[in-house]
Amino acid sequence: MATSAAAHGDHAQDHGHDEHAHPTGWRRYVYSTNHKDIGTMYLIFAVIAGVIGAAMSIAIRAELMYPGVQIFHETHTYNVFVTSHGLIMIFFMVMPAMIGGFGNWFVPLMIGAPDMAFPRMNNISFWLLPASFGLLLMSTFVEGEPGANGVGAGWTMYVPLSSSGHPGPAVDFAILSLHLAGASSILGAINFITTIFNMRAPGMTLHKMPLFVWSILVTVFLLLLSLPVLAGAITMLLTDRNFGTTFFAPDGGGDPVLFQHLFWFFGHPEVYILILPGFGMISQIVSTFSRKPVFGYLGMAYAMVAIGGIGFVVWAHHMYTVGMSSATQAYFVAATMVIAVPTGVKIFSWIATMWGGSIEFRAPMIWAVGFIFLFTVGGVTGVVLANAGVDRVLQETYYVVAHFHYVLSLGAVFAIFAGWYYWFPKMTGYMYNETLAKAHFWVTFIGVNLVFFPQHFLGLSGMPRRYVDYPDAFAGWNLVSSVGSYISGFGVLIFLYCVIDAFAKKVPAGDNPWGAGATTLEWTLPSPPPFHQFEVLPRVQ
């Protein structure tokens, strides 16, 4: 193959056109139209943003380690860290890693496509993100609250705290940052939908697609339908702040609760956007290391479709405390609990996939099993919070923080690490150190559980969220939680060392290091795959 490619290159030079030439050096990445290079840039970006977001969370836990103000003597800065940590982890870590990174890398490979449908649009989808991230970081250095820098309104940006409460320009920077991140995701969503519907290899019907591709398809539909609503909401906030409109200002006939409705109509689909690609990755990994096909493939695919659909009609369960009618609350309680059904289908299908399988506990598999266990814990506390009467007491306490961190910090992040170790040999051609990867898992597992399990107790005791200080009664579990965050931080260092170690030792991985269980198309290609794959489309039986 190399010979024919070289001969073709000589021939093309004679004619002054070489379809196979691609830019090298920095141009290869800055001008990239290659889904693998763009996916790699997304993953590197996600790691950088993730380290920054994790550093902020460790600063938050360092502050809360003891009662009294420890390090945030300008107490507004504590809320800036809370806000930035949330926005960074959601928009610049989880989404770029799962959708931009693994999605770009493996959707074309898994459906037998040569690339994405719109390669140049793919490029700007990525490059909008560093600009967006830059704007968010800039917001922390300009005035927000009077006499203090940065946005301290929480990632939810509730008015009036984000309007009259932040007269400085910081919130405007954050709004423009979110606009760019949203534009990036909408363009990416259009690209994925077009690619998955139009570029599948012959024989690759929708019902033969790998579940990871299904998960990305559902996810990008959620993005396409929910992000424009967020864009509308934050544009209205921008005009309320700068151009005299009163969408959310009661003195002009507006309603601050309208902002919450618009925000959460985006925000609830968003949390499913964060977890659905993880579901897809876990399905591939559990199947691979159990050496058998996923149990209930069609049920798994349509469970994700159902989760995506119902996810759009439950948004006000974030708003039980704003004074909705009992009938409205009753509807949102019931609708929210219905989501537990397709989610349960997925949990039990993963367990059924492992049942009777020839299981091999390599690093990706232990991350996946950890995901299933911890995501289930997070799901159970979610069913608790779905009850409006219970939520009245637990709303804005650490019980809510514990709930969503169990599905995100111990759910989505575990899925990302599972996917990282699963596909790292395919992306790089190098094998990681199994011992380091397992050490990374166990240190992280112990750390994150120490951080977030005690927060359920704090919430049940009534400790509210987003406060820099707290009564002495809450000191014990906060100390445990903060120690856990340092352990988790050490886990991140093990991860970074594991990556450096793999690139230093360069142990060749082979085309398929996982054996007979790995049945999707990417394992038929070399590791790493060629710059252009599937120039002759594969045929799927």
From Swiss-Prot:
User: For binding heme a3, which residues are annotated in this chain's numbering?
Assistant: H403
Region: Disordered, residue numbers: 1-21
Instruction: List the keywords (alphabetical).
Output: Cell membrane, Copper, Electron transport, Heme, Iron, Membrane, Metal-binding, Respiratory chain, Translocase, Transmembrane, Transmembrane helix, Transport
Write down the chemical reaction(s) this protein catalyses: 4 Fe(II)-[cytochrome c] + O2 + 8 H(+)(in) = 4 Fe(III)-[cytochrome c] + 2 H2O + 4 H(+)(out)
Q: What is this protein called?
A: Cytochrome c oxidase subunit 1
Where can this protein be found?
A: Cell membrane
Q: Which GO terms describe its molecular function?
A: cytochrome-c oxidase activity; heme binding; metal ion binding
Tell me the GO BP annotations in alphabetical order. Answer: aerobic respiration; electron transport coupled proton transport; oxidative phosphorylation; respiratory electron transport chain
**Enzyme Commission no:** 7.1.1.9
Q: Cite the PROSITE patterns for this sequence.
A: COX1, COX1_CUB
Q: Which NCBIfam families match?
A: CtaD_CoxA
Broad enzyme group: translocase
Q: Where is the composition biased (Basic and acidic residues)?
A: 8-21
User: What family is it from?
Assistant: Belongs to the heme-copper respiratory oxidase family.
Alphabetical list of InterPro entries matching this protein: Cyt_c_oxase-like_su1_dom, Cyt_c_oxase-like_su1_sf, Cyt_C_Oxase_1, Cyt_c_Oxase_su1_BS, Cyt_c_oxase_su1_dom, Cyt_c_oxidase_su1_bac
Cross-link type 1'-histidyl-3'-tyrosine (His-Tyr), residue numbers = H268-Y272
Name residues in a coiled coil: none
Q: Which residues bind Fe(II)-heme a?
A: H85, H405
Q: Which organism is it from?
A: Bradyrhizobium diazoefficiens (strain JCM 10833 / BCRC 13528 / IAM 13628 / NBRC 14792 / USDA 110)
Any idea which positions bind Cu cation? H268, Y272, H317, H318
Membrane-protein topology: Multi-pass membrane protein
Cellular component GO terms, alphabetical:
plasma membrane; respiratory chain complex IV
Transmembrane regions listed in the UniProt entry: 40-60, 87-107, 124-144, 173-193, 211-231, 262-282, 294-314, 332-352, 365-385, 404-424, 441-461, 483-503
